[in-house]
């Protein structure tokens, strides 16, 4: 039997066949379990032109005790790396070869060892690797801050002898051409008091080129259901709009169509919303409602109006404190659980403030003497507004 420990190489030795009485026709080795670690990196995938990146989907099987990490990155050229050459002038190094051309992998490999100064990620033209996707889901949005032409995928496998992981397939959706070459956006103000309704202005600047599809709908993510959309302005002038959706995930509005005739025109969306967590991200997307199957194009954070000192879609808290629970109230303040259908339940409403990630939340009731009545809720929650109901019965 082979040893149970993982092995990489195996030496097979047979005595010299001096009399020619035997020969080897086939040689097979069988082992148990899975390779402890393996990694797959795809070739750079050329989409043929800039495209809006949509959903990444997969089929995965991961045994208990094993781990599979799937990630992706996107860029603007066909090589995600930068190659450096020593100039031998002190510690100076350059990305150019001796003829002044930007080096490629091929030209880098032709250098003498002493000339090779290393390979680094190309952060100018490529985004970094995404965080690993949660494979318990079947799909998730591709992580890219704007339309890109090139995509690369990576999968890392960590296994034990008895547990392994498998990827059946990985696929992704794109729309080409995109609805816009680029849609930049920033939000103001960038600081707000925790849990209080604040009016925000979401500024967008579309960059439209020939062939872009155009868009007529804006989708903005919010930490809770907003109070409402107060105004939409094109170049400072109010325009008509329709609210298509408002819920706990955000809102969507229909606006006058944006195409090449509105290239570089400032769009403002004014809405009111509370913020519960430092660094709340108001991400957004634009799309063409007449083509619902196309990818919704992500909005890129950046400078839109030089008079607005933001350049971000993130909002912080102006009154950081150690309090985690805010705005606790009972609705109605008094209730009568007598079964007549009127005020038979009380709704316990509260805000969770500045919670990092997800936390375990427990709602426990006590009487006026401090005696425990019971637990009415237990479960994970993030920063935001929450409510739970109690029917007046001991739990």
Say what each PLM segment does:
Residues 317-395:
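Short loop/turn motifs at secondary-structure boundaries
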């Amino acid at each position: 039997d082979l040893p149970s420990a993982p092995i990489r190489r195996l030496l097979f030795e047979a005595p010299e066949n001096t009399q020619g009485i035997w020969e080897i026709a086939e040689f097979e080795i069988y082992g148990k379990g899975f390779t402890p670690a393996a990694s797959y990196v795809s070739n750079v995938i050329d989409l043929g032109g800039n495209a809006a990146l949509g959903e990444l989907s997969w089929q995965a099987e991961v045994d208990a005790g094993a781990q599979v990490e799937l990630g992706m990155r996107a860029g603007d050229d066909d090589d995600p790396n930068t190659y450096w050459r020593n100039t031998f002038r002190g510690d100076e190094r350059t990305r150019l070869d001796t003829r002044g051309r930007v080096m490629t992998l091929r030209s880098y490999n032709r250098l003498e060892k002493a000339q090779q100064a290393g390979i680094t990620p190309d952060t100018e033209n490529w985004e970094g690797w995404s965080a690993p996707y949660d494979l318990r889901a079947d799909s998730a949005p591709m992580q890219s801050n704007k339309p890109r032409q090139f995509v690369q995928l990576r999968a890392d496998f960590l296994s034990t002898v008895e547990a392994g992981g498998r990827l059946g397939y990985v696929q992704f959706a794109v729309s080409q051409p995109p609805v816009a070459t680029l849609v930049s956006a920033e939000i103001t103000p960038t600081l707000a008091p925790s849990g209080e309704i604040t009016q925000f202005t979401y500024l967008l600047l579309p960059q439209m080129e020939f062939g872009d599809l155009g868009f007529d709908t804006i989708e903005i993510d919010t930490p809770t259901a907003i109070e409402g959309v107060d105004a939409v302005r094109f170049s400072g002038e109010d325009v008509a709009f329709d609210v298509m959706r408002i819920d706990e995930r955000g809102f969507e509005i229909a606006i006058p169509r944006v195409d090449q005739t509105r290239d570089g025109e400032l769009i403002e969306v004014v809405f009111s919303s509370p913020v519960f967590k430092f660094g709340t991200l108001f991400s957004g997307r634009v799309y063409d409602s007449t083509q619902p199957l196309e990818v919704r194009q992500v909005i890129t954070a950046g400078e839109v109006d030089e008079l607005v000192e933001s350049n971000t879609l993130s909002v912080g808290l102006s009154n950081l404190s150690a309090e985690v629970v805010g705005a606790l109230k009972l609705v109605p303040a008094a209730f009568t659980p007598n079964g007549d259908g009127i005020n038979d339940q009380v709704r316990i409403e509260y805000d969770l403030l500045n919670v990092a990630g997800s936390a375990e939340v427990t709602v426990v009731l006590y009487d006026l003497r401090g005696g425990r009545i019971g637990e009415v809720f237990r479960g994970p929650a993030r920063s935001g507004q929450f409510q739970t109901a109690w029917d007046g019965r001991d739990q």
